[in-house]
Amino acid sequence: MPDEKLPQYNEVWNDLEKGCLHSCPSYSVNNHVNNPIVKQNSTLTQPSLRKKNTMAAPARLRKRSENVRLTQARYAIFHIFLPFILTLLLYHNFYNYFDQALADLNSVVKYVIETIVLIFTYVMTVIIVYFSFSLIKLAFEEAYVYAPSVAKANEGLAKAIAGLAKYVAKAIQGLAHIILSLLLFILGLEVIEQDEETGDVEMSSMRGQAITTEPASDNTMAEETDCNTSKDVESGSN
């Protein structure tokens, strides 16, 4: 109904009643949109009431996440996986390639080199495990990006998937920390075992030297007694 306090609104109302909002030359759509009363309540001028493009944001996020994954994959290939493979080859063929080279070195130096290679191998293993879990975590965290398109803009399902992904990501992160702790524990055990083996080798080498020196002394004593007896026999015959 027309309102006496709002003359501009009354003008629009009259035009609407006449049915000449778009046809009357005295009034145009621009005047209708620029009207302060209509502008305040119009869906054309309020951004919050406009039709939102629901596919723009997920597509942009998907593209950004794909770029992030490509960058991480390249970093993993050139900075993690290739050095790890080379380290494994070095570690498994360590004695074959470097046994002769390290034969003349001190046992302490050899033990230090072996320990460094072992620690580096386990560090690279931990990095690969943690990186793999990080990729899985990233995939679960990005589930909410794909949820609207899969659920056809069903907000309930999207929130459920996002919440589940959040807890799964936390669980994966905790599992990665547990694996890291176990690997470090195994590393400590192997270092201790390697130290014991080097100690046993040193003790066995010392025992071998002692065993080889004792028969030599017995032989020299036997030779001396034989020489003395032969001298006595010669003197008696004379």
Curated annotation (Swiss-Prot):
Residues 206-220 have a biased composition (Polar residues). It is found in: Membrane. Residues 229-238 have a biased composition (Basic and acidic residues). Its main location: membrane. It is a multi-pass membrane protein. Residues 200-238 are annotated as: Disordered. This is Uncharacterized membrane protein C1682.06. It comes from Schizosaccharomyces pombe (strain 972 / ATCC 24843).
